[in-house]
Amino acid sequence: LFEDRLTIQYQIQEMLRIEKIFDSAGIEEELSAYNPLIPNGSNLKATLLIEYADIEQRKIELARLANIERAIYSQVEGFDAKSTIADEDLDRSNSEKTSAVHFLRFEFSSAEILALKTGSNLIFGINDERMPVAITVDESIKQCLLADFS
C-alpha cells in the first residue's frame, strides 16, 4: 500500500478516534509516529502487508520469508535497480521469521524522477529465489505515484 499525505491523515484520524485521543500531547505523539511515512518529494513510501487467511499457513510463510523485505527493489527503466530501505523505525525481522507488516522507503534521484515524468517505466520487484517477482507499474498508477515527487 503506497502512502501519501492523505492516507496518513486518514490513519492518524482513525487512531485518534479509536484511542479517543483529544489532548494536544496525544495528538502530537500520533503525528510524530505517522508523519515519517509521508513521502518527502524524492521518495515513495509504502506499507508492505504479508497476509495469509489461515493462521498456521501464515506462521509457516513468515518463517519461510525471513528477511524478504531486504530483497525488495525499485527500478526506473534505463537505471540500475535500487534496494528498498525497510523498517527504519525498528527491526521487524529476525533469523527465524519476518514480520507481517513492513514500512518501506524507495529513494529516487532527480534524473530518475525526470525519466519517470517523461515516460520511463517504473518497476518493483523482489530479488529472492523464495519469491522472485518483477512488476511494471501500470501507467495510471505511476501517474498517481508521480504526485508524490512534487
Segments from the language model and where they lie:
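Long, contiguous binding/interaction regions
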Residues: L1-N43, E51-S150
